Amino acid sequence: MKQLILVLCLVAISCKEKRYHDQEHSTTVEHVTGALEDILQFQKKMNDEFKDPETSPLPDRYRKDFETLDFYEPDTTYRIAAKFSRTPEALPFMMPTTTERETEEVVFGIITFNLKGSTHKLEVYQNQELLQEEKYSDYLFLPFADLTNGEETYGGGRYLDLTIPKGDTILLDFNKAYNPYCAYNPKYSCPLVPKQNRLDIAITAGVKAFKKD
């Protein structure tokens, strides 16, 4: 896979030095392998969901021949330990969707990260209706847009599901970016990406646009 940088073992003079480098190499390989397994597991889960008539957003005419979503190749460049800053003073607001429906959200925090030589910020939201359900008590919603939209990815942007971190760091993995359901079926109502979450870079990771032909 592209961008997967493995630590090469240097030829060491002593056995002790060689064991040190071998251990470092092994630890790095395990870290990368674990990240890849996590991404591939996400892709499998998505495909299983789309194949299942009980959970698939696809109309029957598309689901019956469905095999797999189109993903970018896993790329750990887009798996980032980002800074997380809470915004406890934020007030609820109504987020527009692709229909007349609106969702009540609160800006729960700001995510700051470095990618492609520059610093970027994204707002992350907590849905006030979902908050009433215990299983969503630590759920955060991150809609974002980037320069791939309308070309390689869905024109309306993509989403990430996150969990409230315990500290001030959060794992931001764009390999798990997915399309809103309305990208597959117009019957769904999907939150629109706020203008402050429009990135001026291309995020070539996650799910690509759905080809209906």
Predicted regions and their residues:
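Extended, aromatic/histidine-rich regions of cofactor-dependent oxidoreductases associated
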Residues: 20-21, 178-213
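Acidic, glycine-rich flexible loop segments
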Residues: 141-178
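Start-of-domain marker
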Residues: 17-89
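Sec-dependent signal peptide recognition
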Residues: 1-7
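C-terminal motif of bacterial Sec signal peptides marking the signal peptidase cleavage site
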Residues: 11-14
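A mature extracytoplasmic/lumenal domain signature
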Residues: 84, 124-128, 146-148, 174-178, ...
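Extracellular/lumen-exposed scaffold segments
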Residues: 61-66, 93-94, 104, 196
